[in-house]
Amino acid sequence: MSFEGARLSMRSRRNGTLGSTRTLYSSVSRSTDVSYSESDLVNFIQANFKKRECVFFTRDSKAMESICKCGYAQSQHIEGTQINQNEKWNYKKHTKEFPTDAFGDIQFETLGKKGKYLRLSCDTDSETLYELLTQHWHLKTPNLVISVTGGAKNFALKPRMRKIFSRLIYIAQSKGAWILTGGTHYGLMKYIGEVVRDNTISRNSEENIVAIGIAAWGMVSNRDTLIRNCDDEGHFSAQYIMDDFMRDPLYILDNNHTHLLLVDNGCHGHPTVEAKLRNQLEKYISERTSQDSNYGGKIPIVCFAQGGGRETLKAINTSVKSKIPCVVVEGSGQIADVIASLVEVEDVLTSSMVKEKLVRFLPRTVSRLPEEEIESWIKWLKEILESPHLLTVIKMEEAGDEVVSSAISYALYKAFSTNEQDKDNWNGQLKLLLEWNQLDLASDEIFTNDRRWESADLQEVMFTALIKDRPKFVRLFLENGLNLQKFLTNEVLTELFSTHFSTLVYRNLQIAKNSYNDALLTFVWKLVANFRRSFWKEDRSSREDLDVELHDASLTTRHPLQALFIWAILQNKKELSKVIWEQTKGCTLAALGASKLLKTLAKVKNDINAAGESEELANEYETRAVELFTECYSSDEDLAEQLLVYSCEAWGGSNCLELAVEATDQHFIAQPGVQNFLSKQWYGEISRDTKNWKIILCLFIIPLVGCGLVSFRKKPIDKHKKLLWYYVAFFTSPFVVFSWNVVFYIAFLLLFAYVLLMDFHSVPHTPELILYALVFVLFCDEVRQWYMNGVNYFTDLWNVMDTLGLFYFIAGIVFRLHSSNKSSLYSGRVIFCLDYIIFTLRLIHIFTVSRNLGPKIIMLQRMLIDVFFFLFLFAVWMVAFGVARQGILRQNEQRWRWIFRSVIYEPYLAMFGQVPSDVDSTTYDFSHCTFSGNESKPLCVELDEYNLPRFPEWITIPLVCIYMLSTNILLVNLLVAMFGYTVGIVQENNDQVWKFQRYFLVQEYCNRLNIPFPFVVFAYFYMVVKKCFKCCCKEKNTESSACCFRNEDNETLAWEGVMKENYLVKINTKANDNAEEMRHRFRQLDTKLNDLKGLLKEIANKIK
């Protein structure tokens, strides 16, 4: 039966008790902390590892020369060897153990490859050998052992088989596995070594692949070079020669294996000597208990077989008897195909049936075997097939990247689940499938209807699924009873944020926090730092970090789901974060918070690819927020609007609107539901149906407010105070406040212009004093905004203009009031005039309220940035031309003013068409210049001996032409193209851009005091006095945070949870519909192809 067929035919297991393992399975094994010196290694090897020498010479009657049955000549035996006649040779009787003399490092000549090797007796204890590998050769404890067998002779490797081997090596590298092979440079072992080499080079991994070759010492060619000299007591490096042209039956060692174990039984030229020791080592490792293993506390081992003959068959037989699962590659030929074909037989297996398969797949081999040997083969095959659960077959033609790993994991699972000791260890089985990411097996075989899982049973595997980024398993555990709220204890979160949190991410987060310094980034950084502070306490060099703690330590315990979501988001765990997001409360807020974090981190990441991934994930969460809010708004507008202003301390105390704006999520802000909410804020209690001209008219004729000209969204409760309520509702509307401010500002500009043009005297008159008072009110308002916004105040261009205008005005007052001389008075007036420009340009801000003019302001702002970069390019041409022109025409001009005019000013004017007239000698006018340089004229050009201009016209005129061509045509058109691109970008998102900018205007006037200018100054004085009083009395705010605990919040979040489920159902339905549509299209295409094929056949028949 094939791998897929066997997998589908497995029956569900009955319930059992969960075993427990102390630690989680890790793909990176732990190596011993004990370090050994070279002398300790030599002493250990010489004390525990032996070689075998034949001590009885038994002549081989079949040999032509005087050769012992051990394979060595008599001269090659040690001194004192006894001579026997016609006695059957046995290594236990006729050989003796001596301390090994071949071990150390092996250097393959001309290839530069190094590895370790050891000659050891075939009776070496497996425990001692394992100790050598792990503690003295410092190999990490394997998480998996893959024993590869088959095809010991040279053969042409098929491309499909090479791909399978490549995937096998990748699995070994990623899982921290050992690969065991025959270790020679022939057949399968040679190809395995080449794939190991290619993967090591291409992946450039710090974790080297461990490939252990176990070969027979007596079959190794050039083995004399491996023997140490008698005086070599320490480190020894053998220079091994790989002679591929040798024709003797001996093998050369493979240069791509990292470790070589050369098994010695005292004979020469006898193959398969190493099989016994290899089988014992595999069995020992498979039975060895490891704390890091997911295989019931044991190290998993699997036999991987392809092709092969007698020895491969024996190796598979031995593995099956040792309860080691085997993966057989069907299509690789020989014994592997025999086993694959017999696995699929459902009838009773008979000897004739087995022999038929042998003859079919190994005709030449079977024809040369005696009948007794064939019976042995049949017996071994029957023994193998008595344990079909230990056999997994994959087809070579269908073996893709995932098939090999799935086959290995499936083989391990079948062996584990059918083992008498482990078949009820559901926890161990689940860990195994989790490690290999086999979700389907876990769903079909473990999470069945006949077993009920407790939340505590799944907590350990849930933690593993989180750190290994297994989102599908996380979802599976949640669907089967895991309580995420109970699972996320403070200890679990501390482990996640400290041990399983990237240091690079933490540094980027700290950089972002310092660069942008907003509430969310500060909160998240403190959250992470709070979990990591135990590690910082060990670093005394950074004591300032010890003070980084959350003000409320219980915050993370109140919002563990949000903390876990932040952990996943910061590390770009895309699918995992989506699973966790579905479990959180306040999903809309969480999605916008994720978008904000990811976009901010993307700005500080040096890796372009990582930054792009963060941007992509941020856009996905913005889309989720948009779609979920649309779902909510279509169901209930009022509750959806409550979601917009719902804030949570887990997201820095920000609400949805604030996070969306900070993340520049224009798509979210442009949603109809959000815009309707902003419109309600903008008009306040005034009905949106009221025409704007009616509101403006009521500003000038106030009694009309109570005459019904303006309609309101609701009626006053107290009818006796109806008129008062109308006036209060009208004048507290942000739109009315805005309109009144516009009227006031226009009046202010008119007064400013009147003072500058008609009433500016040495002693200020009444209009000018009123102007000072109005500017003081504006100054108070800017101080209030700065106090409320803090550092973020200067991130707004309009605030920068306001500040600049006020400072200019103060400077103008200083000069203007210092009127002891006319020069100072004039300077003050000039400053006032320049300041008037700033105040007038500030009027542009009011146009953002217009749907048509608002985007145009954005275009102007972005085009100013284009002009800024354009000036850098233009400056290159301008300075190059200006300096060259001045140097050619004039000599030693000392006046900086005229140098500036000639080098900068005149070339700048040339861009607008004013051609320089001093580059043509025929039109040069000496009356407009000076030779002495002491007049208010430019310096005349240098003259020659004939009193004619010295400069060569064949240089100056072409120079002007080239400059005019470059600036007036190339650069100006480049600027026009830049403007066109900028306008196009804004125009594409015209509506979104305006709606996004509208938010700032609405919030600005919603946060203002609802008192008309300039009377608001009295409210400012009141606020200052109140603040001073609080500071003097040292009043403290004792209100505790009620975040997420108010009834209205709980009701809103519960309703949002229902809407979220509806939204997820729609997404999944849409995805299924798309998949079904694709399948339908493929079926239609297949039908058309079949019809076309039939038509072509008919045409071919007609032609014939």
UniProtKB/Swiss-Prot annotation:
Coiled-coil intervals = 1067-1104
| Record: residues binding Ca(2+) | 782, 785, 799, 802
Write out the topological domains of type Extracellular.
759-765, 818-822, 891-895, 913-953
Which ranges insert into the lipid bilayer but do not cross it?
896-912
Its GO biological process annotations read: calcium ion transmembrane transport; calcium ion transport; intracellular calcium ion homeostasis; positive regulation of cold-induced thermogenesis; response to cold; response to temperature stimulus; thermoception
For membrane topology, the record states: Multi-pass membrane protein
**GO CC list:** external side of plasma membrane; membrane; membrane raft; plasma membrane; plasma membrane raft
The catalysed reaction is: Ca(2+)(in) = Ca(2+)(out); Na(+)(in) = Na(+)(out); K(+)(in) = K(+)(out)
Cysteine pairings via disulfide bonds: none
Protein's job:
Non-selective ion channel permeable to monovalent and divalent cations, including Na(+), K(+), and Ca(2+), with higher permeability for Ca(2+). Activated by multiple factors, such as temperature, voltage, pressure, and changes in osmolality. Activated by cool temperatures (<23-28 degrees Celsius) and by chemical ligands evoking a sensation of coolness, such as menthol and icilin, therefore plays a central role in the detection of environmental cold temperatures.
Stated name of the protein: Transient receptor potential cation channel subfamily M member 8
What is the organism of origin for this protein?
Answer: Rattus norvegicus
User: Taxonomically, what lineage is the organism?
Assistant: Eukaryota, Metazoa, Chordata, Craniata, Vertebrata
